[in-house]
Amino acid sequence: MGSSSLVISPRKLRSDVYSYSYENDSNTPLVISVLASLIERTMTRNERIAKNCTWPLSNKTRVFDCHEIPDMTIQSYLERIFRYTRAGPSVYVVAYVYIDRFCQANPGFRINSRNVHRLLITTIMVASKYVEDMNYRNSYFARVGGLGTMELNNLELDFLFLMGFKLHVNVSVFESYCCHLEREVSIGGGYHIEKTLRCAEEIKSRRCGERRFNQIARIMM
């Protein structure tokens, strides 16, 4: 899915959320890029603060920490989830609501590079179950997210208990989070989103080049 021709505007974001069509739209929905930009900036801020101070960490929320940090940008990871699960744009808005509720319910939790991927696949899967009529099994989401099925099952259960099973999102809450994402685009957010997209594309190109180089190297050996 090409992202280089993606139109970045509040109107485009709103249009994607309410009328995105897999058949007619070749680009990734804008909400994914906006969410990736927001999360990456949050991670950068959290990791900068972490260097200067320490905050109490709950052992309960450490279940989202991975042993090794995945070598994949947030943008690329969200695009992968979108490509293989076909979860609609509204799912990502609801996932954003859930992440916010989770952080409010667990003040000691901070999104960082070690926990963000597991948190995202879990929240998107839970949001998909809430929003969509038809869903893939947990085992499929686990493969897409790079986890074991039992691992994702446990993360889902932990997530639900840690946020107090507060899954209901009414229309006014949904609209307020859509408006927040729109403001992210209109108030200088476009630059950050374009930067996020460029970084993701550069990493993809570099990896493709490395794969081609390795294939050539194997042939020459």
Protein language model regions, located:
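Non-catalytic, well-ordered alpha-helical scaffold segments
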Residues: 29-33, 89, 93-96, 117-121, ...
